[in-house]
Amino acid sequence: MSSLRRRIETVMRSGPDENMGLTGAVLRLVSLVYGLVMRLRYKLYQKGFFKTGKAPCMVVSVGNITVGGTGKTPMAIYLARLFNDWGLNVAIASRGYGGTMQKQGGAASDGKDILLTPAEAGDEPWLMAVKLPGVPVVVGGDRVKSANLCASQFGTRILILDDAFSRLAIDRDLNLLLVDSQAPFGNGHVFPRGLLREPAEFASRADAVIRTRADRGAGQAALPQGKPVFSCTHKPKGFLEYFPQKGTSGPKIVRHSLDDLKGKKVAAFAGIADNQGFFDGLSSLGVAVLDRLSFPDHHAYTLRDRNIIVETAIKADVKALITTEKDLVRLTGWDAHGLDLYALEIALEFEQAQKFEDFLKSKLQIGE
């Protein structure tokens, strides 16, 4: 990561009134302009200058208002499994960030077969497709087009929009806003001085707020008034061992319990929004992390990166590597030079699951 990028990220995560020198001043100026643009954009949608399309099925939007990870993908998976368990015909629509099919759009999965590679679908949609048998997953920047595809090809009754809180071009029946429990709005500044994708007052568009990683404690930022607030945690579920295979079906995965890797000496690496949280989580599970490597969020691993990872493991004298599920997807086909390769599997757990389910049924008018 370049020194400039590191400096910008430091400013974005600094205190709201902290003096960050010339870089901070420049980013503050840019963020003021960006905030004005986002307010104008919202007004243009309100006045009808920008059109909001209607889907032919019920739409549940899952998203955040900040840059970085708040658990959108685990939440989309949680909802898809829940609706599927209720006997509802559900599908997921994702933008397909980083995938070659983002502009064209298409089905990553029809609920039976995986139809696209990770490079085509994007890492997160492909991961959802693998983890959700029976649930179609489509990708594409045009969410209305994706909704029509799901309704016509799969008979979808409920469509989950992944990462769509700020995507105003499609109407939705339920708008779920995910916020980090410790810092719901970052430092309160919009991008690039802070982490906000749009001004914090726009959080009021949410029908409900979900505090993720609630086990880390709650921050002091005021959440939208009059909105139900639910809390959930990211719980380690187990470890996935990776064996490379070619084709859209991706790698062969073998599941292990959390106890299977206790005391195992590994080198860890990650390219997500909260790498340190991932490393700390491994240590808390009893994994002996002897060395670690951090990469930017959504990092595309080059041959050089992979060689550095292997060299790190060799220097640490370990026989295994461990990473996140999202990073594992980006390494499809990699044999890790004979090293064992694992990923930590994460699942959401609500503090008051029944209360949240009752809320969903009420808002979406789903019968028992």
UniProtKB/Swiss-Prot annotation:
Catalytic activity entry: a lipid A disaccharide + ATP = a lipid IVA + ADP + H(+)
Its EC number(s): 2.7.1.130
> Which residues make up the binding site for ATP?
66-73
Q: Which InterPro entries match?
A: LpxK (IPR003758), P-loop_NTPase (IPR027417)
User: What GO biological process terms does the UniProt entry carry, in alphabetical order?
Assistant: lipid A biosynthetic process; lipopolysaccharide core region biosynthetic process
The terms under GO molecular function for this entry are: ATP binding; tetraacyldisaccharide 4'-kinase activity
User: What does the record give as its pathway?
Assistant: Glycolipid biosynthesis; lipid IV(A) biosynthesis; lipid IV(A) from (3R)-3-hydroxytetradecanoyl-[acyl-carrier-protein] and UDP-N-acetyl-alpha-D-glucosamine: step 6/6
Specify the enzyme's EC class, one word.
Answer: transferase
Keywords (alphabetical) are:
ATP-binding, Kinase, Lipid A biosynthesis, Lipid biosynthesis, Lipid metabolism, Nucleotide-binding, Transferase
GO CC: one term? Answer: plasma membrane
Family, according to the entry, reads as follows: Belongs to the LpxK family.
Q: Name the PANTHER family for this protein.
A: TETRAACYLDISACCHARIDE 4'-KINASE, TETRAACYLDISACCHARIDE 4'-KINASE, MITOCHONDRIAL-RELATED
Q: Which function does this protein serve?
A: Transfers the gamma-phosphate of ATP to the 4'-position of a tetraacyldisaccharide 1-phosphate intermediate (termed DS-1-P) to form tetraacyldisaccharide 1,4'-bis-phosphate (lipid IVA).
User: Protein name, please?
Assistant: Tetraacyldisaccharide 4'-kinase
